[in-house]
Amino acid sequence: MNDHRISRRRFLAAAGMAGAAAALTACGGAASSAASSVASSAAASSEAAQSVELIVFAAASLTETLNAIGECYTADHPEVTFRFNFDSSGTLKTQIQEGADCDLFISAGQKQMNQLDITASADVNKDGLDFVDADSRVNLLENKVVLCVPEGSDKGIDSFDALAEHLKAQDILFCMGNSDVPVGQYTQKILAYYQLDEAALAAAGVITYGSNVKEVTTQVTEGSVDAGVVYCTDAYSAGLTPVDEATKEMCGQVIYPAAVLKAAPNAEAAKEFLTYLQTDKAMTVFEGVGFSAV
C-alpha cells in the first residue's frame, strides 16, 4: 500500500470520527431541545399514552448509534423507553431461540436472521424456526470489514495482502471473531480468499479469538495482538485507523437485517421504531460512524 493510500485512509478515518461525534452530538442536542420544548404538552399526553419498554436485541457494533438514536426517539415519544441487549448476533439468535423476550432483532449478518425466519431457505433454517415476522423484515444497513493494527505498530501490516504474508510466516498474533459471530464469518471468508488454513494457524498459536466484535476491537486497541479484523464502525468508535478495507470479492457485502419478532410483547411499537430507523434523522447517526443505507 503506498503512502497516498495510507494518508487517504487516515483522512477518511479522521473524517469518520468527526462525523460520528457530530452526528451523536447533534442527535443528543436535538433530544435535549425536543425534551425541553415539549415538556408541558408531553406530560399531559404521556399520561394518556400507554408506557412501552421496547426490547431491542442488536449486534454489538450498533451499541453507540442505537443508544443515541434511542435517546432521540424517547425525546419525541416520551411514552417509549428502551432495553437494549447488545452482543454477537449468534448469541442473540440463541437467546431468542431459547425464549427470551424481544421486540426487535437487528443482526450483523443475514445468517442469524435467516435461522429464525421460516421463509428463509431450509439450507440455512435447518430447524424450521419461526420467530421472525417476515413482513417486517428489512435490510437496514451496510457496514464494511476493515483491517486494524495497534497505534504505532512496526510490523508493517498495512494491507490484507501484507496480513496474509505474515500469517503464512506465522510471525504475528492475529485476532478475529468466533465462528458464530458475523465478523468472524466474514474473516473466515477473507482467510479462504488467501487460501489460509484457519485451523492450522490457530493450532500454531497465530490466531486468537473474540466472542464479539467489541472484544476483537479491544484486543487491537490495547495492543494485545498485532492485527485484527473488525467493522469500520467499531474502528471509528474506538479511535482506530483502518489500514485496509475488504472488498466484496473477499467477504461479500456486510448487510444488517432487522425484523420484529412474531412473539414481540410490543409489536406495533417495534414496527414504528423500525420505520424510524430508516428515516433521514436516524440515518444521519448511522452514517456518522461509517454505516450506509442499503
Walk through the language-model features, giving the residues of each.
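A generic structural motif
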Residues: 77-82
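N-terminal post-signal-peptidase region of extra-cytosolic proteins
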Residues: 91, 127-133
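Generic low-polarity alpha-helical segments
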Residues: 8-12, 76, 116
